[in-house]
Amino acid sequence: MSQPVAITDGIYWVGAVDWNIRYFHGPAFSTHRGTTYNAYLIVDDKTALVDTVYEPFKEELIAKLKQIKDPVKLDYLVVNHTESDHAGAFPAIMELCPDAHVLCTQRAFDSLKAHYSHIDFNYTIVKTGTSVSLGKRSLTFIEAPMLHWPDSMFTYVPEEALLLPNDAFGQHIATSVRFDDQVDAGLIMDEAAKYYANILMPFSNLITKKLDEIQKINLAIKTIAPSHGIIWRKDPGRIIEAYARWAEGQGKAKAVIAYDTMWLSTEKMAHALMDGLVAGGCEVKLFKLSVSDRNDVIKEILDARAVLVGSPTINNDILPVVSPLLDDLVGLRPKNKVGLAFGAYGWGGGAQKILEERLKAAKIELIAEPGPTVQWVPRGEDLQRCYELGRKIAARIAD
């Protein structure tokens, strides 16, 4: 079990590290590097715990609290978000500290009562601008609905310029250290991008508005302590700037080709498209979906300007392994992307129309409709067309 970690004098990380989790939100999100469930204790004249942990790790949380002060006494329990990975230990904490006063949004209170109807607790509904004094420090709250649940809010400690934004600015990564200056910067940003792309992308417009709101009130931020992953203390501006880019849909001259194949015909088309894109000066990421992690593909789509999806026809439909990516894209609604559908068929088609309909449903602009299709096997002229389309797309998305 890891130990409490001081963020500054009197403020501690008291969360838990989950080294073994490999899927999150059921099977929806791959977590190859594990995750953390971050909770924070603020000790002043009064003591506040900001968020809890996933229920299986409740004893770790309680043990850390006892290392700081035993017996544990909490004046406040701040619930930024009621999802089980953050509020799963709510019953255990309320049993340990039944007099703790819960601070949360109205939507969070409604969710807590739905999840834990058997627990009675004292509470105050907070809104943006509500402030609670702990002594030398205070807590100020900023509602953040749909980032990423309706109940979500940020907690801010103005005296320390410390932002506790729950799921915002987080990453799914398990580490033995807690801060951004202790972990490879590229690794952290890669996991932060994957987190944003797969969880927060549908809420990009709201994120832009929230970042603008924070800027308008001139919120000083020295440290960002999210509820998953590392704490940003060296360069919190880096992740804020990244969120601003991602939320606006800023991309680069990059294309993602995601496909699968039965007897290599669609694969040959994918490679010809890639050759054209590369010849046009474009960065390319190529994924055969049956051997690729869908969440990693979506992470690469985040900063790409073009998305090319290929499938042969099977039973007048697309390959089953291709469908989940398209389903995700429809829900995630990536911004400012152009796309192309391609594939092979035998005696009857069908996949091409489905691919194009799904890409359009994801608000991806088709650069050619219909895209390239071939019967049975691609010939030289078919591959040349794919190559030329690749060059055309590269020119379209060039910097």
Swiss-Prot record:
Catalytic activity, EC: 1.-.-.-
Cofactor: how and how many bound: Binds 1 FMN per subunit. Binds 2 iron ions per subunit.
Chain residues that bind Fe cation 2: D85, D167, H228
Residues covered by region (Zinc metallo-hydrolase): 32-221
Molecular function terms, GO-annotated: electron transfer activity; FMN binding; metal ion binding; oxidoreductase activity, acting on NAD(P)H
Ligand binding (Fe cation 1): H81, E83, H148, D167
Induction remark: Constitutively expressed.
SMART domains, sorted: Lactamase_B
Enzyme class (EC, first level): oxidoreductase
InterPro entries registered for this protein in UniProt: Flavodoxin/NO_synth, Flavoprotein-like_sf, Metallo-B-lactamas, ODP_dom, RibonucZ/Hydroxyglut_hydro, Rubredoxin-O_OxRdtase
Pfam families hit by this protein: Flavodoxin_1 (PF00258), ODP (PF19583)
Cofactor or coenzyme needed: FMN; Fe cation
Domain (Flavodoxin-like) ranges: 255-394
Family: In the N-terminal section; belongs to the zinc metallo-hydrolase group 3 family.
Protein name per UniProt: Nitric oxide reductase
